[in-house]
Amino acid sequence: MLSALSNDPMYFPPLETAFDNGLLAYGGDLSPQRLLSAYTKGIFPWYDNNSPILWWSPDPRCILLPENFRIPKTIQRELKKCTFSVTINNAFTEVITACATLPRTKQKGTWITQDMKMAYIQLHKLGFSHSIEVWDNSTLVGGLYGVALGKAFFGESMFHIAPHASKLALVWLAQYLWSYNFDFIDCQMPTTHIMRYGATLISRNEFLTRLTIAVTTGTSQASTKEAL
């Protein structure tokens, strides 16, 4: 039976009770306290307007590690032709709005509900959610957002309206994080696209071990608008 969350924002059921697809619990809210509690436990929300809030902890877990990260040669060639500029934390609301509203191939609707959008904007104001923006002059043409805790970054969503803009955002983010000794980027579930960059599948238990180390060995709360 799927567990229902209580009013205690810190409570989540044991991860071993998750279904085979990673679904762990439903209900609760998207308060900063509950979201941060979830991320530190290896849990994230993923649902749509037709369901209650659903909480997931997949096994295996897909992550990018600095030692395995690679840029495919075809993407390297594409990025060399780009004339875009990249910023960080300059347009978080615009990025998450684009991620929520732009249509995607083979996807109906969006999992970034209005409540989800407002929750991550609040996390951004608190210094935990961050965005990468890709610009063509003054036009936002791509980007991504996610959550940073300690030395772990949890990727949430990306978008592009110009070719290769989201690829540039991902490569820029990874290189930026590795330069600050981040331990990994959590990609949650594998996709053909992310596996091209050297993503690794690890067990839930190994992920939790890495996560515990990452969130206790450094701080990533933004001290300036530009920093993680």
From Swiss-Prot:
| Keyword Ion transport among record annotations | no
A GO cellular component annotation here is: cytoplasm
Pfam family for this entry, one: Leu_Phe_trans
What GO terms are given for molecular function? leucyl-tRNA--protein transferase activity
Reactions it catalyzes:
N-terminal L-lysyl-[protein] + L-leucyl-tRNA(Leu) = N-terminal L-leucyl-L-lysyl-[protein] + tRNA(Leu) + H(+); N-terminal L-arginyl-[protein] + L-leucyl-tRNA(Leu) = N-terminal L-leucyl-L-arginyl-[protein] + tRNA(Leu) + H(+); L-phenylalanyl-tRNA(Phe) + an N-terminal L-alpha-aminoacyl-[protein] = an N-terminal L-phenylalanyl-L-alpha-aminoacyl-[protein] + tRNA(Phe)
**UniProt EC number:** 2.3.2.6
Alphabetized Gene3D superfamilies for the sequence: Leucyl/phenylalanyl-tRNA-protein transferase, C-terminal domain, Leucyl/phenylalanyl-tRNA-protein transferase, N-terminal domain
Location(s), subcellular: Cytoplasm
* Keyword match Acyltransferase: yes
- Superkingdom field: Bacteria
Q: Read off the InterPro entries from this record.
A: Acyl_CoA_acyltransferase, Leu/Phe-tRNA_Trfase, Leu/Phe-tRNA_Trfase_C, Leu/Phe-tRNA_Trfase_N
- Keyword list, A-Z: Acyltransferase, Cytoplasm, Transferase
The principal location of this protein is cytoplasm
GO BP terms: protein catabolic process
Which enzyme class, named as a word? transferase
Q: Which family does it belong to?
A: Belongs to the L/F-transferase family.
What's the stated role of this polypeptide?
Functions in the N-end rule pathway of protein degradation where it conjugates Leu, Phe and, less efficiently, Met from aminoacyl-tRNAs to the N-termini of proteins containing an N-terminal arginine or lysine.
Q: Which NCBIfam families match?
A: aat
This chain's protein is named Leucyl/phenylalanyl-tRNA--protein transferase
